[in-house]
Amino acid sequence: MTSRNYLLLTPGPLTTSRTVKEAMLFDSCTWDDDYNIGVVEQIRQQLTALATASEGYTSVLLQGSGSYAVEAVLGSALGPQDKVLIVSNGAYGARMVEMAGLMGIAHHAYDCGEVARPDVQAIDAILNADPTISHIAMVHSETTTGMLNPIDEVGALAQRYDKTYIVDAMSSFGGIPMDIAALHIDYLISSANKCIQGVPGFAFVIAREQKLAACKGHSRSLSLDLYAQWRCMEDNHGKWRFTSPTHTVLAFAQALKELAEEGGVAARHQRYQQNQRSLVAGMRALGFNTLLDDELHSPIITAFYSPEDPQYRFSEFYRRLKEQGFVIYPGKVSQSDCFRIGNIGEVYAADITALLTAIRTAMYWTK
């Protein structure tokens, strides 16, 4: 481990502001009203307001990574007679399929391939053919490739077929404007260390209260019982059932303040989008090609094909970039040799320019 700080060009954990880090210097008591009412309850209200102005929604915080919350929703929202259609076009959709299988949840996996946009007509046909499907689950920003999936079109199908709609918005909520009521989303899942620019330690679910209230007794897990966690927070004014990650929560409260100071989700989305466009333009000028067509890209992370030069090794490229203060991500696509660069967090136009200069310097195979 080194004391040197790097700029993380990853989809989270990501580079955070100095003030978000400093917020963790305070120690909180998990029984204290100053913490539970003054911090946790405020966060819950702010998250719900960020998601929609409509009534009837609530939020629940849950210890662990984003995958913990995804598993909590799947394991709590689906009763023993329910069945979920899981739309999968990457590692995170595939993870939902794996979770459902391990929990014994009836499911239909629609796998459209890692570089293909989900076919809404195909989803329509599946729903039409199988009336036993009660829920639909999908990822919004699939960071395996950087693809932004059509949650609006699938949401319209969920409304038409009267299905409960679950969206993993891990790498989009807080960075892409959305109204979950207008999108017909019943459960939206995200994490502290993504677009809101906090640090790892907890995830959260913003849910239609009527749906969440019907989940009692469904959970396949004690710790991941979303209904029980919600009732504890509701009945005890922000109290967590088990140990609260207090320092992470304080950092997140500060991150929410900084989101508002930046101009809210719309302003942050504009920054992320400009970062991504500048990154792609600069990488293409250096000779790199994107895995996806431009119209499929999210403003969060971009996958680039690895150079075909036989001298190229990602590990060496990574090392040379890290020496210059930049950290990127390896590829996760099974059928293509690629690497990924994220552009969220405390990353601005000057950082993208500096990164591109560092990449040019690190391209040892061209020398």
From Swiss-Prot:
GO-annotated biological processes: organic phosphonate catabolic process
Enzyme Commission code: 2.6.1.37
Transferase is among the record's keywords: yes
Post-translational modification N6-(pyridoxal phosphate)lysine, affected residues: K194
Keyword Magnesium: no
Keywords (A to Z) from UniProt: Aminotransferase, Pyridoxal phosphate, Pyruvate, Transferase
InterPro entries for this protein: Aminotrans_V_dom, NH2EtPonate_pyrv_transaminase, PyrdxlP-dep_Trfase, PyrdxlP-dep_Trfase_major, PyrdxlP-dep_Trfase_small, SP_NH2Trfase/AEP_transaminase
Catalysis performed (reactions): (2-aminoethyl)phosphonate + pyruvate = phosphonoacetaldehyde + L-alanine
Cofactor(s) needed for function: pyridoxal 5'-phosphate
GO molecular function term, any single one: 2-aminoethylphosphonate-pyruvate transaminase activity
Pfam families, sorted: Aminotran_5
Family per record: Belongs to the class-V pyridoxal-phosphate-dependent aminotransferase family. PhnW subfamily.
Subunit (UniProt): Homodimer.
Stated role: Involved in phosphonate degradation.
Full protein name: 2-aminoethylphosphonate--pyruvate transaminase
Species of origin: Salmonella paratyphi C (strain RKS4594)
Gene: phnW
